[in-house]
Regions:
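NAD(P)-dependent Rossmann-like dehydrogenase/reductase catalytic/cofactor-binding core
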Residues: 9-12, 17-136
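A short glycine-threonine-serine/GTX helix/turn-capping micro-motif
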Residues: 1-2
């Protein structure tokens, strides 16, 4: 989840830096991924997705896939080693054993929930047809 959220936040922040509105930036990051790309990849496979998208998206995906892989490979290597050597388990046990664990966790989650990106997301999700209120 951290990798996915981190990538989404990075793209969102880049779009905002270049003048995109919060809702537009959210649509171009989270909505496109969760409402389209990941569902099609799960149903049909990444090879199908590559073969059936626009030529612009296709070319960009092919040209940038390797760069993204190389950018995150060291992070996955570090994470794997930290899981393997017990560092991550130790952190979890230490954090979860603190008497104020729940308050600290709630503060971390509130920071995310109250960020501009996820506040925009709440508004955008309300616009999805499945979330429209039914009239009596």
């Amino acid at each position: 989840m951290g990798a996915i959220a981190g990538i989404m936040e990075a793209q969102y922040n880049e779009l905002r830096k270049h003048g995109h509105s919060p809702s537009e930036a959210f649509n171009e990051t989270v909505e496109e991924f969760t409402q389209s790309l990941i569902k099609l990849a799960a149903e049909k496979g990444m090879d199908w997705l590559y073969a059936n998208c626009s030529t612009t998206a296709q070319r960009g995906a092919l040209d940038w896939k390797g760069k993204f892989r190389e950018a995150v490979a060291p992070l996955f290597s570090e994470l794997y080693q930290r899981v393997k050597d017990g560092t991550e388990a130790k952190i979890v046990l230490e954090k979860n054993s603190q008497p104020d664990y729940r308050q600290k966790l709630d503060a971390e989650l509130a920071c995310m929930r109250n960020s501009e990106m996820w506040q925009a997301g709440e508004k955008v999700r309300d616009l999805r047809p499945e979330n429209w209120k039914k009239e009596a």
